[in-house]
Amino acid sequence: RGSPLALAQAEEVKSRLLAAHPTLAEDAVAIVVIATTGDQIQSKPLKEFGGKGLFTKEIEEALLAGQIDMAVHSMKDVPTEVPPGLGIVCLLPREDPRDGFLSPVANSLEELPEGATVGSSSLRRVAQIRHVRPDLVVVNFRGNVNTRMRKLSEGVAQATFLACAGLHRLGMADRITAPMPVDVMLPAVAQAVIGVETRLDDKVTIDYLALIHDGETAQCVAAERALLA
């Protein structure tokens, strides 16, 4: 995927691979951008088009066709079942799993003016926003991190929520007004985890990835994804 965040995550996998395998030449790991249906649909909520698999289908097709050797995903976007022959074989250490509250007019969700507009396209976030502040108006907010922050600065909404991990990876942690306590806004399953998918018969790639796999993160992700299975 070609968004700044997707590229940053791919670069993190590449840098960890090169660090773990000093004999591996830098040009031995090339990043290939593949546009997904989910990236191209910006005007409507994803639930109208089939949900999370929209961010993985084209990438997995390229993996099965042998056009790429590994696929880098945000694990929160990966369906609980992956296509036969593929597997999530590597998970990087988890970043901050919390959602970040961003607003130019308030220091917290509770401090937003009555009837304020909040931008979000996430059913999970919208449900929890309305539980805490049923008076707020929620508008659809699609797009990558930069697009959503631009909409916020243009006044399309007075607040929005973005994953803290994504902002950290983009070097934009200073844009977070306040991290949301997990007992107020529960993060998505496997939020803040980068996963690497490959063909299960590609033992060479699996062996390379084994050195950057984080077992503790894998246990957490397995437990969380089991709730969705």
Question: What is the predicted function of each stretch?
Answer:
Residues R1-A35, Q40-I41, L46-F49, T56, ...:
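Small-molecule-sensing regulatory modules
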Residues G38-S43, A71, P79-V82:
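Short active-site-adjacent helix-start/loop capping segments
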Residues G53-Q67:
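Short, well-structured alpha-helical segments in soluble
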Residues D69-V72, Q158-A159:
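Short, Asp-centered acidic motifs that coordinate Mg2+ and/or phosphate
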Residues M75-V78, V82-D135:
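A conserved helix-loop-strand patch within extracytoplasmic ligand-binding domains
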